[in-house]
A protein has these predicted regions:
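Hydrophobic, aromatic-enriched alpha-helical segments typical of multi-pass transmembrane helices
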Residues: 1-267
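Intrinsically disordered, low-complexity cytosolic terminal tails
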Residues: 265-290
Length: 290
């Protein structure tokens, strides 16, 4: 039986990345793009860019929103895994709390960042469509400074989103590695060791993705291609595969964890009874001697 939360999260990651790939390929294959004109902030080229963005905004917006929901939906499987691996909070508490913090941080950051980016791009598209961006120095100057300013703001906002995406991959690396340690050090394993090793592969790809995102600032074209490939592999293959595999194991693992938790509780209760009995006997002996 498949855990629904794992399957849902995996499907959302696949869908968001397919939409992102379609959106990016359309953007890359448009005929009017000129990298030199882009870096020179050529006003004519900038206006063409904003016309394209206004026409294709819904596809990019849909991909971004679904991606944010996918990261947030990842919280539910991670909370279940942490509860199972910690045996209801009785094992390696610090390690498993760290996993929860990383998962919650990645999900929250993506959601907030996506909301801020969507709001700023919608406002920028409104500016490009209805505001005067041609004549700032004088009424008929046709200086087009407004277009240059708008494009610079857009690049800065995109940079914010780039760093948010990079930090998400760093968080996923931490989650996968900590879960590997948790499973590897468990005597009676509830989740499979092979699944944990698959998570290590996911973590290594996540680090490569993080590095490629950061190094885009050094060489945008080269590292954007690397980031595109690693992100596609992560979101379409590794993360969904990791989640589907987890989904098949999780129901049985939760049942075993409940048994272990009950055993631990019974053991603690029995120990308490023995301690209380010993204390009572000591008090009785003391009273007799007195």
């Amino acid at each position: 039986m498949m855990d629904i939360s794992c399957a849902t999260s995996a499907i959302l990651f696949i869908l968001s990345n397919i939409l992102s790939i379609v959106s990016l390929k359309k953007y890359q294959n448009r005929s009017n793009f000129d990298y030199e004109a882009f870096t020179e902030l050529d006003p004519t080229h900038i206006q063409e860019e904003w016309e394209y963005r206004n026409e294709h905004r819904n596809l990019e917006l849909s991909a971004g929103v679904i991606n944010a929901v996918a990261w947030f939906s990842l919280l539910i499987p991670m909370l279940q895994v942490v509860w199972v691996q910690s045996v209801s909070g009785t094992r390696q508490l610090a390690l498993h709390v760290t996993v929860v913090v990383l998962a919650f941080g990645a999900a929250t950051t993506e959601l907030i960042g996506r909301v801020l980016y969507t709001g700023s791009t919608n406002a920028a598209q409104w500016l490009a469509k209805d505001f005067n961006l041609d004549n700032w120095l004088s009424e008929d100057s046709n200086d087009e400074i407004g277009w240059r300013t708008l494009e610079m703001i857009h690049v800065v906002v995109r940079g914010m989103l780039l760093w948010i995406d990079a930090l998400e991959w760093l968080a996923l690396f931490g989650i996968s590695m900590l879960l590997f340690v948790s499973i590897q050090t468990q005597k009676d394993r509830l989740l499979g060791r092979r699944w944990a090793l698959f998570g290590v592969i996911l973590g290594l790809f996540s680090i490569v993705d993080f590095a490629a995102d950061v190094l885009r600032l050094e060489s945008w074209r080269s590292f954007s291609e690397i980031a595109f490939v690693t992100t596609a592999i992560n979101r379409v293959i590794l993360i969904p595969g990791w989640l589907f595999w987890l989904g098949y194991q999780l129901p049985q693992a939760k049942a075993l964890a409940r048994k272990q938790s009950t055993t631990v509780a019974e053991g603690m209760q029995a120990s308490s009874v023995v301690v209380a009995k010993d204390a009572t006997e000591e008090q009785t002996e003391s009273a007799t001697l007195t």
